[in-house]
From Swiss-Prot:
<keyword id="KW-0234">DNA repair</keyword>
<dbReference type="GO" id="GO:0006310">
    <property type="term" value="P:DNA recombination"/>
</dbReference>
<keyword id="KW-0963">Cytoplasm</keyword>
<feature type="region of interest" description="Domain III">
    <location>
        <begin position="148"/>
        <end position="196"/>
    </location>
</feature>
<dbReference type="InterPro" id="IPR036267">
    <property type="entry name" value="RuvA_C_sf"/>
</dbReference>
<comment type="function">
    <text>The RuvA-RuvB-RuvC complex processes Holliday junction (HJ) DNA during genetic recombination and DNA repair, while the RuvA-RuvB complex plays an important role in the rescue of blocked DNA replication forks via replication fork reversal (RFR). RuvA specifically binds to HJ cruciform DNA, conferring on it an open structure. The RuvB hexamer acts as an ATP-dependent pump, pulling dsDNA into and through the RuvAB complex. HJ branch migration allows RuvC to scan DNA until it finds its consensus sequence, where it cleaves and resolves the cruciform DNA.</text>
</comment>
<keyword id="KW-0227">DNA damage</keyword>
<dbReference type="GO" id="GO:0048476">
    <property type="term" value="C:Holliday junction resolvase complex"/>
</dbReference>
<comment type="similarity">
    <text>Belongs to the RuvA family.</text>
</comment>
<feature type="region of interest" description="Domain I">
    <location>
        <begin position="1"/>
        <end position="65"/>
    </location>
</feature>
<dbReference type="InterPro" id="IPR003583">
    <property type="entry name" value="Hlx-hairpin-Hlx_DNA-bd_motif"/>
</dbReference>
<dbReference type="GO" id="GO:0005737">
    <property type="term" value="C:cytoplasm"/>
</dbReference>
<feature type="region of interest" description="Domain II">
    <location>
        <begin position="66"/>
        <end position="132"/>
    </location>
</feature>
<dbReference type="InterPro" id="IPR011114">
    <property type="entry name" value="RuvA_C"/>
</dbReference>
<feature type="short sequence motif" description="Acidic pin">
    <location>
        <begin position="54"/>
        <end position="55"/>
    </location>
</feature>
<dbReference type="InterPro" id="IPR000085">
    <property type="entry name" value="RuvA"/>
</dbReference>
<dbReference type="GO" id="GO:0006281">
    <property type="term" value="P:DNA repair"/>
</dbReference>
Amino acid sequence: MIFSVRGEVLEVALDHAVIEAAGIGYRVNATPSALATLRQGSQARLVTAMVVREDSMTLYGFSDAENRDLFLALLSVSGVGPRLAMATLAVHDAAALRQALADSDVASLTRVPGIGKRGAERIVLELRDKVGPVGASGLTVGTAADGNAVRGSVVEALVGLGFAAKQAEEATDQVLDGELGKDGAVATSSALRAALSLLGKTR
């Protein structure tokens, strides 16, 4: 099991980063908030979890152990795979997720694309007493950029998560045309989080 990766950041994309450690480049799938802390060419460390399947081994990276532990807790729930667990942590930061579980807030969980009412109820039932008390928020906001500059990146990330291109474009445009983009600058990670939340509501 690989618990963390430290080294030079070779690449930062919307859903993953490549970090070179001991001469080996590791592709690490990560949440928008974790990716927002990385800069190409700089040194970085991500706490990781490895998911092993019959035909693959995939690393998932997080800014801290709390997010990694929540990811692993979500994976323990029947019907929740890595993609859905990562989408949950993209929509809700650690503190918000813990609060939703503590409050049995099914409605908040159904904002995550792919989680319906029954799935949310199952997550609450199985994790409410396992995740511990609500801690401080670890949400990191990415560097602001012009809305037009991030549109293509957000659409690409949504398509990568399994949404149809038209659906992804409409959600992204709605986010950038709304309150988030009214000042002409928006963080890519914030736009992606908002689009995911919107898609969860309109599913």
